[in-house]
Regions:
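Class I SAM-dependent methyltransferase SAM/SAH-binding core
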Residues: 71, 77-122
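Short, glycine-/aromatic-enriched active-site segment of Class I SAM-dependent methyltransferases
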Residues: 169-186
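A short acidic, Gly/Pro-enriched loop at the edge of an enzyme's catalytic core
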Residues: 124-133
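Short alpha-helix
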Residues: 187-203
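Conserved class I S-adenosyl-L-methionine
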Residues: 10-66, 172
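Core SAM-dependent methyltransferase catalytic element
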Residues: 215-235
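Conserved beta-strand signature within the Rossmann-like core of class I S-adenosyl-L-methionine
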Residues: 161-168
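A short glycine-rich, Lys/Arg-flanked "PGG" loop and its adjoining helix->strand segment in the class I
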Residues: 148-160
């Protein structure tokens, strides 16, 4: 099920909670959505090897009860994570800001449910509760000031003790403008000690951590250090 205007579907079921004190300050993510609409399936061509994401997705799938409801936050094309979780027998709800990405995810993972939505709308439209969350390279698309709010929102949308697999690129940047596959996107990152603290402060226990040096296939994207955290929601 795809949204039609980037603002979710239906009427909000409840007022925002984790985001209620967030100062939007005229923030506009239309440029982010347009960039990924333009990139489309070239994203998977630029990042063909996703060993870290696949391994972390496998950990998540193994932690879930049978037929669990899982949120894929920033699902992109649905590959590999949404497909991996669906093939493991789980019910996948994927969201992405890009309508083109949502369309590709629907084609790649016909058993999943996908919506064109912003991250904060998961709470606004009460999509949970979820049995688990995958957040691979989605939180880095937010300014640093918003990331703790997004993590607290995920904490509220998860059942107690539920697993979360997430990844970020290690970098000390905030809302940094980056050329990316012929477009420009804005990204944020942390050095790993600060990232761990931000995640813990949002109410998560970190159960495991892996890092990978990654060189994308496209010369338009610089090499990066990818950090994968395996987490669990604390009460």
């Amino acid at each position: 099920v795809s949204g039609t205007d980037g603002t979710g579907e239906g009427r909000p079921k409840s007022k925002a909670r984790a985001y209620k004190d967030f100062d939007w300050g005229g923030m506009d993510r239309a440029g982010q959505a347009a960039a990924f609409d333009s990139i489309g399936d070239r994203y998977d061509e630029a990042f063909p090897h996703k060993e870290g994401q696949i391994a972390s997705g496998a950990w998540l799938a193994e932690q879930l009860p049978a037929g669990a409801h899982v949120l894929d936050l920033g699902c992109g094309t649905g590959l590999p994570t949404a497909r991996q979780l669906a093939e493991a027998g789980h019910r996948v709800t994927g969201i992405d800001l890009s309508g083109a990405m949502v369309k590709l995810a629907e084609e790649n993972v016909p058993d999943g449910e996908f919506r064109r939505m912003d991250i904060y709308e998961v709470e606004r439209y009460d999509l949970g509760p979820f049995d688990g969350v995958a957040a691979f390279f989605s939180l880095l698309m937010l300014p640093r000031a918003e990331i703790p709010y997004a993590l607290r929102m995920l904490h509220q949308q998860l059942r107690e003790g539920a697993p979360m697999a997430m990844s970020m690129v290690e970098a000390d940047v905030d809302d940094f403008s980056l050329p990316f596959l012929g477009n420009t996107i804005r990204v944020s990152g942390y050095l790993r000690d600060e990232l761990r603290q931000v995640v813990r402060d949002a109410g998560f226990e970190i159960c495991g951590e892996d890092s990978y040096a990654y060189a994308p296939a496209s010369t338009d994207v610089p090499p990066e250090i990818q950090i994968f955290l395996q987490c669990r929601r604390r009460p």
